[in-house]
């Protein structure tokens, strides 16, 4: 959640931003292994602060799927979701076979090559894998919990099959993600919602969305979406 501190500052004091922490971080409760259970848990936590809608929801990367599932569960419970913002996430239900997956990796490699960051990206990925293995083997209790939760959440997202959301969605993409087939992403997300998919492009990398200067651009896009939703 600390990665969203910059975003919160850019949104300003008059626009609170609440982050929700995965269950199991304290070691006293089991971690979730299904996106549906994560969403139900977050809704329960959210309702301690705001029992009823209208709700303004958002998620970044893998968190977008959880926010999308939360929106569906809230609607099923008769609550209003005034705004749903999804940030730089491919749509669920794709479950690509191995060949398209290799094509996807090749497209990403080409982007980093053109952006002159290919070797940096490869080194970062290797370092991330190494750190996760290190956390599991020799890390302290808290570090091992984090690594275990990461693995559980990765499996949960692989297994997730989404339902339908009834309403509009604001979709914010990084410049990095636009090397992927825009039409495919747009069409697939559009199939999962009944309203309009409003897409905005932020001129930064995926990770840069919550860093400087990308966080400012992301906050501006979210702020504009909030104002539009409130005006309806």
Q: Which residues make up each language-model segment?
A:
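A hydrolase-biased, glycine/serine/histidine/acidic-enriched motif that marks catalytic-domain neighborhoods
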Residues: 1-232
């Amino acid at each position: 959640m600390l990665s969203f501190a910059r975003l919160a500052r850019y949104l300003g004091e008059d626009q609170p931003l609440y982050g929700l922490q995965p269950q199991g971080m304290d070691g006293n409760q089991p971690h979730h292994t299904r996106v549906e259970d994560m969403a139900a848990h977050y809704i329960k936590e959210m309702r301690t602060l705001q029992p009823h809608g209208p709700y303004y929801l958002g998620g970044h990367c893998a968190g977008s799927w959880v926010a999308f599932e939360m929106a569906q569960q809230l609607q099923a419970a008769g609550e209003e979701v005034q705004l749903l913002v999804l940030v730089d996430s491919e749509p669920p239900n794709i479950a690509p076979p191995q060949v398209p997956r290799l094509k996807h990796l090749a497209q990403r490699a080409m982007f980093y090559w053109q952006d002159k960051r290919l070797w940096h990206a490869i080194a970062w990925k290797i370092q991330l894998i190494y750190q996760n293995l290190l956390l599991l083997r020799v890390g302290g209790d808290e570090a091992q919990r984090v690594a275990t939760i990461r693995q559980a959440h990765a499996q949960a997202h692989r297994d997730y099959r989404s339902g339908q959301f009834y309403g509009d969605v604001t979709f914010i993409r990084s410049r990095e993600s636009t090397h992927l087939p825009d039409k495919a992403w747009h069409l697939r997300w559009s199939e999962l919602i009944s309203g309009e998919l409003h897409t905005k492009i932020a001129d930064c990398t995926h990770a840069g969305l919550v860093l400087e200067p990308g966080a400012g651009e992301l906050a501006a896009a979210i702020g504009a979406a909030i104002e539009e939703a409130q005006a309806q």
